Amino acid sequence: MKQHIKIGITDCGKFDNYRRWLESEPGVEVVRLSMHFQNAADTESCDGILFSGGEDLQPALYGKPEYVEEFGLQEIIPARDEFEYQVIEKALAGEKPVLGICRGLQLINVFLGGTLVPDIPAV
């Protein structure tokens, strides 16, 4: 049984909460994967990836660019989407387990061909 595990976490405003949660277990090492570091290649050294929460995904990624105006989406960071697409591509190519929380789950869904409704009450 492996005594040490390395988990990559995508960067977000609550990164330290995720880091503390994972590092509360002995033998867990966390790698911060960030568009600011452009370190998607570090995914390859990780045993698994946690895609964190945060801003809305670009609706163009799931074929609905009109949603930006239709739903008044303002918190979109295209550079984060592009970076995390690189991370998920590397993770899946390396058959690494992935976990998405909130935005992270939406990212995985869209990457695998799914779609989203940005504001369920508005539908």
Question: What would you call each of these model-derived segments?
Answer:
Residues 1-99, 110-117, 121-123:
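N-terminal beta1-alpha1 cap of cysteine-dependent amidohydrolase-like domains
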Residues 102:
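Conserved G/P- and acidic residue-centered "switch" motifs that form tight phosphate/ATP-binding loops
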Residues 106:
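Cytosolic ligand/metal-binding cores
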